[in-house]
Amino acid sequence: MIDAFYSAPADVPARHGALLRFDDYEGDAPPAGVVQRILYTTTDADGRPAVGSGLVITSSDPLPGPRPVVLWNHGTTGVARGCAPSLRDNSATRWAIPALDEVLKRGWIVVAPDYSGQGTAGAFPYLIGQGEARSALDAVRAAAELPQRWLAPDVVVWGHSQGGHAALWTSKIARAYAPELHV
């Protein structure tokens, strides 16, 4: 079920990557992790303002200082709005994100975007590289605005299936679209 969390506010900031809201994820969490849902601004595949959603997964015992980011791009989960990983109970587990427990143990923060149009209203950029990549990079920007989550600019991009496609495009456009991030 898509709840009100995924609805865009009446006034959406023009700046892409702005954190609009966050709350606790109600699905399964990794044994040593804390999971939050985020809603943020992004730019769709056609360059128009859009809203995206996703998950931010951190260690329940974080190491001090800014932490590097693993930007996880999910594989195909369906093309409907209700197919967003952040709407599913097991999207923040080691079965959904390979090596998640090890990544958290090493102190990395995982940002896992749904891509715009999944969870949120709008066109879903299925295998449209620009849209997937912008949504992914903007999820990292939004996660950096979470309280008590200190993200370093160092970002490793990772994905499987559709997420592999998104990861390649994210790496391709990162320098121009999000120059503050070290992808």
Language-model segment annotations:
Residues M1-L63:
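Catalytic-loop region of hydrolases
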Residues D44-K105:
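Short, surface-exposed "cap/lid" segments of acyl-processing enzymes
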Residues P66-V69, R106-V111, A152-D154, P179-V183:
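Loop/turn elements at helix/coil->beta-strand transitions in domains of secreted/extracellular proteins
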Residues T76, D114-Q118:
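Short beta-to-alpha linker loops that shape the active-site pocket of alpha/beta-hydrolase fold enzymes
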Residues G117-P125:
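Glycine-rich "HGGG/HGxG" loop immediately N-terminal to the catalytic nucleophile
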